[in-house]
Amino acid sequence: MSKVIKKRVETSPRPTASSDSLQTCAGVIEYAKSISKSNAKCIEYVTLNASQYANCSSISIKLTDSLSSQMTSTFIMLEGETKLYKNKSKQDRSDGYFLKIKVTAASPMLYQLLEAVYGNIKHKERIPNSLHSLLVETITEKTFKDESIFINKLNGAMVEYVSTGELSILRSIEGELESLSKRERQLAKAIITPVVFYRSGTETKITFALKKLIIDREVVANVIGLSGDSERVSMTENVEEDLARNLGLVDIDDEYDEDSDKEKPIFNV
């Protein structure tokens, strides 16, 4: 086991928001803006369309002409403290795992998507009739929970293991779920795509599907050393072998039961 010591590790202050402010339309938009490193215009407009499910509206994004001409996708990139959990109550279903991302940075696509969706609802345009009764002032917004985005649509996603100076390893996430769920929380990047706008009474949220997870191949733990300084300690002896044998992983019962949450979960759409 190797270790690299970095003394007095300092990170830039992370934007924070109160739970109450993240549950308002204006608050969630402002928070998404605060974690965006750019304000470049990406989205021309968004249309919400009725779907076969009464509580769900499909999301259609029209990018700016300059981005459309470059065949740019509508995927959204996030970065943050990431952890894959087993969902105790749903092991027999396809959503037996879900990803929790405590977002520290996001593409401007995220705040512009939220801004466009709630702008549509406010002005009663580009939305299905089922949403006309909604008032942005009374909505309880649930896209973020504890400054995190939860994603349980993982089917078809890829995971890319990266390491400085070495070729990355790209794999289907289906075969990596068990080993990833045993890792500690790690800084990672995620590429996601919006799926539906979900409404339950006055509670609303945008749900996402994972397209790609980009994560360090090496499992590293931050510990406080004997001198009181922060140390980054590698928990893997050989990264290549560990990927195959699932060594260097935290062997704990790190499962999360959505049904134990006192709040009504609406991120399972």
Curated annotation (Swiss-Prot):
Chief subcellular location: host cell
The induction annotation reads:
Expressed in the early phase of the viral replicative cycle.
| InterPro entries tied to this protein | Poxvirus_I3_ssDNA-bd
Give its localization.
Host cytoplasm
Which keywords fit this entry according to its UniProt record? DNA condensation, DNA-binding, Early protein, Host cytoplasm
Keyword Acyltransferase applies: no
* Gene Ontology CC entries for this record: host cell cytoplasm
Q: Which GO terms describe its biological process?
A: chromosome condensation
| Keyword flag DNA-binding | yes
- Give one Pfam family, short name only: Pox_I3
Q: Name one GO molecular function term.
A: single-stranded DNA binding
Q: What quaternary arrangement does the UniProt entry report?
A: Homoomultimer (Potential). Interacts with the small subunit of ribonucleotide reductase. Interacts with host FAM111A; this interaction protomtes OPG079 degradation through autophagy.
Q: What else is known?
A: This protein is synthesized in the early as well as at the intermediate time of infection.
The similarity annotation says: Belongs to the orthopoxvirus OPG079 family.
State the protein's name. Answer: Protein OPG079
Q: Which organism is it from?
A: Variola virus (isolate Human/India/Ind3/1967) (VARV)
